[in-house]
């Protein structure tokens, strides 16, 4: 199925909308949110000078797309290219450089660096930024750390958007989703979640008529089959996803109840 440009834009815009609203309450308890925003919590954007910000999760997803397109373009125009994960690492490093006011490279490859609104310093995950400043990034087999924070998860969204049956198969995209997250988050529970997310995004784009629950469960089963023999955490991730589905379908649980579990 052909995918329109508006579908890609819609995915990234949806991420930007949710991220811009949610980043202000990231890592806060329900009580803390109520103290700041009232008994019903956050009900809209927390605007800065009248605007909702494009924050770090959205930035990282966009830079991942930029890096993958850069690599693909070089392959098509020059007939040579490195593995796709190398371009994800390159674009992630350039994004990290945009998050600090010093030490920016004089030569870069991501045109998004010229978009000031995509380079605002909003990343609070200093450990991830530190990892991206090191000479060697992580891979699933040789992790750079044991971080399980969600900081790098949106790289998998860029990977999922990149899927096309003429250049990659689903197995390769799922692996690339895991590898992209593993660059900065070494915990298997983190990078295996990247495989699940890349699978869901790639399938949603091409078969939007399929029920979301079916696609999510398909992604979980694919992740277990591909990684379960090597990582026991694959089954833990699968259990958490099943819990999320159960909670979402329960008429007796409010979103707040689910958040507090």
Pin down the residues of each PLM region.
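Structured, active/binding-site neighborhoods that engage oxygen-rich ligands
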Residues: 1-261
């Amino acid at each position: 199925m052909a995918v329109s440009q508006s579908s890609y834009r819609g995915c990234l815009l949806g991420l930007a909308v949710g991220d811009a609203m949610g980043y202000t309450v990231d890592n806060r308890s329900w009580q803390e949110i109520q103290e700041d925003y009232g008994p019903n919590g956050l009900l809209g954007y927390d605007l800065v000078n009248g605007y909702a910000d494009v924050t770090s999760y959205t930035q990282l997803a966009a830079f991942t797309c930029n890096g993958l397109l850069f690599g693909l373009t070089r392959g098509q125009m020059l007939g040579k290219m490195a593995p796709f994960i190398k371009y994800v690492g390159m674009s992630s490093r350039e994004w990290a450089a945009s998050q600090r006011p010093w030490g920016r490279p004089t030569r870069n490859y991501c045109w998004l660096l010229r978009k000031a609104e995509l380079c605002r310093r909003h990343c609070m995950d200093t450990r991830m930024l530190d990892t991206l400043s090191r000479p060697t990034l992580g891979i699933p087999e040789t992790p750079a750390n044991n971080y399980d924070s969600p900081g790098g998860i949106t790289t998998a969204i860029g990977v999922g958007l990149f899927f096309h049956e003429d250049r990659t198969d689903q197995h390769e995209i799922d692996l690339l989703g895991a590898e992209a997250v593993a660059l900065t988050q070494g915990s298997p529970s983190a990078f295996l979640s990247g495989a699940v997310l890349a699978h869901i995004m790639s399938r949603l784009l091409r078969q939007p008529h399929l029920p979301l629950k079916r696609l999510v469960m398909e992604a979980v089963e694919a992740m277990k089959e591909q990684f379960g023999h090597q990582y026991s955490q694959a089954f833990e991730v699968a259990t958490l996803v099943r819990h999320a589905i159960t909670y979402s379908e329960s008429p007796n649980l409010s979103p707040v109840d689910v958040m507090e579990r």
